[in-house]
Amino acid sequence: MIQLGLVKAKDGAYWLDNPQATRYFWAPNGYNLKSGEGYFQNVWVLFNQAVYGFTDHFSGGVGVMPLFLFGGTATPAWLMAKFSVPVVENKFNLGAGALMGTVIGEDNTGFGILYGISTFGSKDKNLNIGLGWGFAGGEMARNPTVNISGMIRTGAKGYFITENYFIGTSDIFVVITMLGGRSIIRRVGLDYGVVLPFSSDMDGFVAAPWLGLTIPFGEKIN
């Protein structure tokens, strides 16, 4: 049976609510997982993380890059948490969070980021602006990293996604642009796109493919 509270009408057709509305390729936004919902994300086999909604406003997770499986010795691992609230329901959300990690097998390799985010728009069409202060080796970055991301629904099971980072230091300015899409296949998200880094001292053009899979768990739509 269709539950109208969990679907929306579009041009006479019914679309399920966005099942993966809380993040872009990687960056989080001001929407949160519902209590009891979670997901496992894998990117190119190496990048793995799991996130769980402990309440409707707080989520946390763990991540790891198991390089030891591929002959490496050092293994990055991290914890993350996010708190978010709707200021105007389905139109404007605010959030804040942190990621803290280390490289297992190495000394003095603590790293992380503290961030705040503002998300404008609905789960299907939104713009996200974030500021993050990274830290590593006991030192905090002097300048914040700016993140501008967006998502637009293109169909019943498709989304266009962009995720962009602006990183400035006293020596260099870097922009990382990610463009691509997401297809929902039985509530599993298939992310695909291209990563385009630019910097003030680059001479050539670099493009790297992005391919990820996100598998939900916990609460489901019936």
Q: What residue ranges belong to the model's regions?
A:
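Solenoidal tandem-repeat scaffolds enriched in leucines and small polar residues
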Residues: 147-150
